[in-house]
Amino acid sequence: TIGVHHVAVHMARQALQAGIPVDIALCSAAALSHDIGKFGCRGRDARRIPYLHYYFTWQWLEGHGVPTIANIAANHSTWDLEFENLPGESLLLIYADFRVRGNRDAEGRERVQIFSLEAAYQEIFRKLADMTPEKQLRYRTVYAKLHDFEQYLLSHGVDPDPVQRGACTACTPKAALLPRRE
């Protein structure tokens, strides 16, 4: 989740500076809470986390009085890209979630890794054993939409790679959006 937050907020800040309408606080809150529903998947639901956590995320956030965050956070599946009119915050969250993967090291600790869009796509195909031709087509379609979104961001000077050293040439952060240490 922290890796997804890092990528999403990194891009949201630049997007806003580039004139793309995005609510950084909403993007941040949704990215931090997008997988909170995994904690609601217990008992017989535990094996269905990949399918049910969206609902439990929405239920928890809605129940705590933050419906706007709930709508973005709960709709972060790549399959949500099949709908055409998604807010920028949703696109940023879906894009970030697609690129960030948690993998276990030799000692069993989870390590967050940020992949390029292409490498993330390859990683998904490598890991999914039940990849039917229909799923392959859906993932290709999702990848194409995410690639188009990435190209759109790049065309506006948004650097999607948070590990790059140096600032994006198209943006200088607004002081009001920076933490005190920055």
Q: Predicted regions span which residues?
A:
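His-Asp-centered metal-binding catalytic motifs of divalent-metal-dependent phosphohydrolases/nucleases
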Residues: 4-5, 22-62, 71-80
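Divalent metal-dependent phosphate-bond-processing catalytic cores, especially two-metal-ion Mg2+/Mn2+ enzymes
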Residues: 2-19, 33, 43, 78-182
